């Protein structure tokens, strides 16, 4: 490609009067942006306009000067050698406060510590601890202060243990100050320790003595720490030799420290690229860096330079870095497909961003040619295109709004979504919804593939020839939606269709939203799923995968965080990295759009519910909603729609102001170069416009497509479990599982949140108990499965009560044979079974129906008759708890339900933040500690309570109710009829 390694435009240094540093920087940025904005529309292909945009971006990077900790590439210098513990520890007391870490022990170190030697025993006044705040600060919330009077002490005395309250650093001016002024503590060695496993890192530590409380005794004193890791670094004596990651923030525009950091990053980038490209291509550029470095020495020796000189040297360093970056052989394409699109209006929410009526008109489908040259050219691919087929035949796609472009593996065909964006808010009609279109890569043959009152978007070419996409066709509504603003919020999930738009089938029967399907290197379909069956609304919207025909949906990462703040809140736009087992995604917010910070995901390490499988690619931007809370989300929606080129290199869109995003090349070492920006509208979804290897086409194993039905006889769907005891949790001692209970989760069919209130837990699902199937003595099960229904399983003990329950769900398709190893089996351990499972030696079991009142679920039919037979009369006579079945005031429930459910029943709450709700929260079920086994009501169902003896069927009904979240309603409509005990079937199942 001719543009690779081409020198970017070298502007003439501007001559202007000298002004103050801050004012000059602001003036330079404003002038450059004004130059770009004043250019005529056709001039955006000219070198001057692109130069102005690139320079404006460089100035913005200098203004922000975010140099976060990141993996340091091995450089061809002595600096790449092993770092000693005392060398890294020196950064904890060097006086530099950057908001980032000053030292960093090994990741996940057991009981890590850092210490400083004051040189002599000193009566302490206070210790001031500045936390790093470019990563979750809560990791040090249990920090301890320990002391010793002599170096080499065999033991340390703990003189302070923090209470768990999160503290911060210099950026927030909220360090932890430990007061020893009246404690009588004397120490020579001051050690900070975090008990347990921790990736221990702090910004800075200061120690003050009682003799002179104004003097920081720890400053530049010898320090040490327990271990070093990949983020540890040698503290250099001068700024020239310091790695970029240790440079403090600039206090003036275009500081020499920042220029040297750019030079150092250029060297490291050249060293990386030298392994995959001809070194002679990089030699002149490295020589340029050396020459610049010498001139910087001269400036430093002369005591500095005026801002215009520093700016010129900074631009020179950036040009060299940009040239080195464009020598990257992974940038071996000369066209980039992308769309232009305004951020949607209305509610900032992950769901509402993809409703067509909220789209802002403008944008289109574009191609950026020669993106790595001085004069990239932008072409509107649909400028003269007219729809040839579909409702909009004969019309151009304007104004409207575009979304989610997709390129075929051979590079010849493009799919995208488009909405006219007309109508009211909200409105679901052909004119208001997104529909999928197809066009050739040269802009010809524009046809409409989908239409109707459904949102259809996020198309994805499947290797077998079909197209996966996201659609609202299944029906149902968001369970926590319809309140702010009061819009209906339809659910959208995975579908597929033939290449011509025919033969549309449902791939996912999930009851809440899914997004952004793509095909990974193994031919599997990956996508983001919001999964909150009986769980907090805000903890699980991460990557899932399934076969291209929808079979076997699995969460292989991130679905069960220990706490919400410990990892990305949400992961959007997932894509497989070429030649790798890793994936890239955007760490985004629940209460935001699909932008944020970029992460790489590796499923091979075991998931610790936090960051074990996650690497930050852009740590300059915190993880939205995880870090900074809800108020900071809009300002953190900076990066988005990453397209991986390798584990190191990516295309994406970015804007530091989270407003007008341009197309960038970035790498995971902090380099970022602007390729294109439109001053009027954001860019989205850059894709190299070229062929790429097709993943394997996995065979269909269901009979739902027209082609499959024609070739394969219809067969019942089945589910097999090899060994229910094979799990990554501890079963209660002596438990014997005899059956599986199968429960259907019903999609919400009424738009407003908690209308109706299904039960004591907020925002929970209506459900139906389909029945039970036997489990063999070896823990295996094999049974017929209902097609097209979202179901989950409970493992029942010998007495018929649930021991364990899923807090997720699955489904099967026509003809599918779903197999599970166990009950939440360990993903990183192979099964140990030697003999065939007993259940597979027989025919599949039919589902044994549940008692009346369980399907559909109905408290008045399932539970109230038991109370009427055994409890109501006695309670009424003794003026005890009212267990009458008459109507109560709240939610249309009966008196008995209102008095029993919340206090004596058991339920999981589903509201935002309920992960922290104790027994009603959490992310996973603790075996033997939920449902009937954990309810207070269980203590009143035997002879201990006034000699009560319930027949097995009646006690089973009560246990079933308790195991099923102690719900009241089983459908979302006709609540008065349900309260009267009438059978009300769900409208959508």
Question: What are the residue ranges of the model-derived segments?
Answer:
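Conserved beta-propeller blade repeats
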Residues: 398-409, 453-467, 511-526, 561-577, ...
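Aromatic- and Gly/Pro-enriched helix-to-coil junctions and flexible linker segments
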Residues: 38-73, 245-257, 289-294, 298-301, ...
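Loop/turn-rich, solvent-exposed surfaces of beta-rich toroidal or solenoidal domains
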Residues: 573-664
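Trp- and acidic/polar-enriched beta-sheet ligand-binding modules for extracellular glycan
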Residues: 104-113, 121-122, 133-241, 470
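Multi-bladed beta-propeller domains
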Residues: 375-400, 440-454, 498-512, 547-570, ...
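Short, conserved, GDST-rich strand-edge loop motifs in beta-rich repeat architectures
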Residues: 338-360, 417-433, 469-490, 527-541, ...
């Amino acid at each position: 490609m001719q543009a690779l390694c081409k020198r970017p435009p070298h502007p003439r240094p501007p001559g202007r009067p000298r002004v103050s540093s801050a004012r000059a920087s602001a003036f330079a940025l404003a002038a450059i942006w004004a130059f770009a904005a004043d250019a005529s529309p056709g001039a955006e292909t000219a070198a001057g306009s692109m130069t102005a945009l690139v320079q404006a971006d460089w100035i913005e990077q200098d203004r922000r000067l975010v140099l976060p900790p990141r993996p340091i590439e091995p450089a061809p210098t002595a600096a790449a050698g092993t770092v000693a513990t005392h060398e890294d520890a020196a950064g904890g007391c060097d006086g530099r406060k950057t908001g980032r870490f000053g030292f960093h022990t090994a990741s996940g170190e057991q009981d890590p510590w850092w210490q400083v030697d004051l040189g002599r025993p000193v009566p302490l006044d206070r210790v001031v601890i500045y936390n790093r705040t470019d990563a979750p600060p809560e990791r040090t919330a249990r920090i301890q202060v320990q002391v010793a009077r002599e170096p080499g002490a065999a033991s340390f005395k703990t003189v302070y243990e923090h209470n768990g309250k999160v503290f911060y650093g210099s950026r927030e001016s909220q360090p932890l100050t430990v007061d020893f002024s009246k404690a009588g503590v004397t120490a020579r060695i001051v050690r900070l320790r975090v008990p347990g496993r921790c990736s221990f890192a702090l910004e800075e530590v200061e120690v003050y003595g009682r003799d002179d409380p104004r003097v920081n005794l720890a400053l530049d004193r010898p320090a040490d720490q327990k271990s070093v890791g990949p983020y540890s670094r040698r503290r250099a004596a001068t700024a020239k030799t310091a790695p970029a990651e240790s440079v403090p923030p600039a206090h003036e525009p275009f500081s020499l420290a920042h220029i040297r950091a750019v030079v150092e990053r250029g060297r490291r980038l050249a060293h990386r690229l030298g392994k995959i490209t001809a070194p002679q291509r990089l030699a002149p550029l490295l020589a340029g860096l050396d020459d610049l470095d010498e001139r910087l020495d001269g400036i430093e020796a002369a005591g500095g330079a005026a801002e215009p000189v520093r700016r010129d040297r900074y631009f020179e360093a950036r040009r060299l870095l940009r040239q080195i970056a464009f020598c990257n052989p992974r940038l071996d394409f000369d066209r980039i497909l992308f769309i232009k699109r305004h951020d949607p209006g209305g509610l900032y929410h992950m769901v509402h961003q993809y409703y067509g009526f909220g789209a802002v008109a403008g944008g289109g489908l574009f191609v950026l040619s020669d993106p790595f040259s001085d004069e990239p050219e932008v072409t509107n691919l649909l400028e003269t295109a007219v729809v040839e087929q579909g409702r909009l035949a004969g019309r151009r796609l304007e104004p409207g709004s575009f979304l989610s472009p997709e390129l075929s593996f051979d590079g010849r065909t493009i799919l995208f979504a488009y909405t006219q964006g007309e109508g009211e808010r909200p409105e679901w009609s052909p004119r208001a919804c997104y529909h999928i279109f197809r066009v050739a890569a040269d802009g010809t043959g524009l046809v409409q593939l989908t239409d109707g009152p459904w949102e259809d978007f996020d198309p994805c070419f499947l290797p077998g020839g079909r197209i996966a996409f996201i659609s609202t066709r299944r029906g149902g509504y968001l369970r926590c939606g319809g309140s702010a603003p009061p819009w209906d919020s339809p659910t959208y999930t995975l579908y597929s269709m033939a290449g011509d738009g025919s033969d549309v089938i449902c791939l996912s029967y999930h009851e809440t939203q899914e997004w952004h399907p793509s095909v990974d290197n193994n031919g599997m379909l990956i996508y983001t799923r919001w999964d909150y069956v009986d769980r907090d609304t805000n903890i699980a919207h991460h990557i899932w995968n399934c076969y291209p025909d929808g079979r076997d949906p699995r969460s292989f990462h991130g679905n069960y965080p220990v706490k919400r703040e410990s990892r990305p809140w949400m992961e959007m736009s997932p894509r497989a990295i070429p030649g790798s087992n890793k994936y890239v995604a955007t760490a985004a917010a629940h209460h935001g759009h699909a932008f944020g910070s970029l992460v790489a995901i590796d499923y091979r390490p075991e998931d610790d519910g936090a960051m074990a499988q996650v690497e930050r690619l852009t740590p300059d931007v915190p993880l939205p909603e995880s870090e900074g809370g809800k108020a900071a989300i809009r300002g953190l929606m900076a990066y988005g729609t990453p397209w991986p080129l390798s584990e190191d290199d990516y295309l994406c869109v970015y804007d530091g102001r989270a407003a007008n995003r341009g197309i960038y090349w970035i790498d995971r070492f902090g380099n970022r170069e602007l390729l294109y920006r439109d001053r009027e509208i954001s860019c989205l979804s850059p894709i190299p416009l070229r062929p790429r290897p097709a993943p394997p086409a996995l065979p269909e194993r269901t009979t739902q497509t027209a082609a499959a039905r024609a070739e394969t006889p219809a067969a019942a769907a089945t589910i097999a479990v090899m060994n229910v005891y094979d799990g990554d949790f501890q079963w209660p001692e002596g438990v014997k599982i005899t059956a599986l209970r199968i429960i259907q989760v019903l999609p919400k069919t009424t738009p407003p949140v908690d209308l109706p209130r299904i039960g004591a837990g907020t925002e929970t699902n209506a459900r139906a108990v389909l029945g039970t199937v036997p489990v063999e003595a070896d823990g295996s099960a094999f049974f017929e499965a209902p097609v097209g229904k979202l179901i989950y399983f409970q493992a029942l003990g010998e007495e018929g009560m649930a021991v364990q329950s899923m807090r997720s769900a699955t489904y099967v398709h026509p003809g599918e044979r779903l197999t599970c190893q166990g009950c939440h089996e360990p993903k990183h351990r192979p099964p140990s079974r030697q003999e065939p499972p007993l259940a597979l030696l027989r025919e599949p079991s039919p589902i044994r129906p549940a008692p009346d009142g369980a399907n559909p679920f109905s408290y008045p039919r399932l539970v109230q008759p038991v109370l009427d037979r055994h409890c109501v009369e006695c309670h009424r006579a003794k003026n005890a708890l009212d267990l009458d079945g008459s109507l109560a005031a709240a939610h249309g429930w009966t008196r008995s339900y209102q008095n029993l459910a919340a206090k004596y029943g058991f339920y999981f709450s589903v509201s935002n933040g309920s992960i922290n709700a104790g027994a009603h929260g959490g992310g996973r079920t603790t075996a033997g500690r939920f449902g009937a086994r954990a309810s207070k009501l269980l203590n009143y169902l035997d002879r201990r309570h006034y000699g009560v003896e319930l027949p097995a069927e009646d006690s089973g009904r009560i246990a079933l109710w308790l195991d099923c979240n102690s719900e009241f309603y089983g459908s979302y409509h006709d609540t008065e009829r349900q309260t009267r005990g009438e059978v009300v079937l769900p409208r959508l199942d």
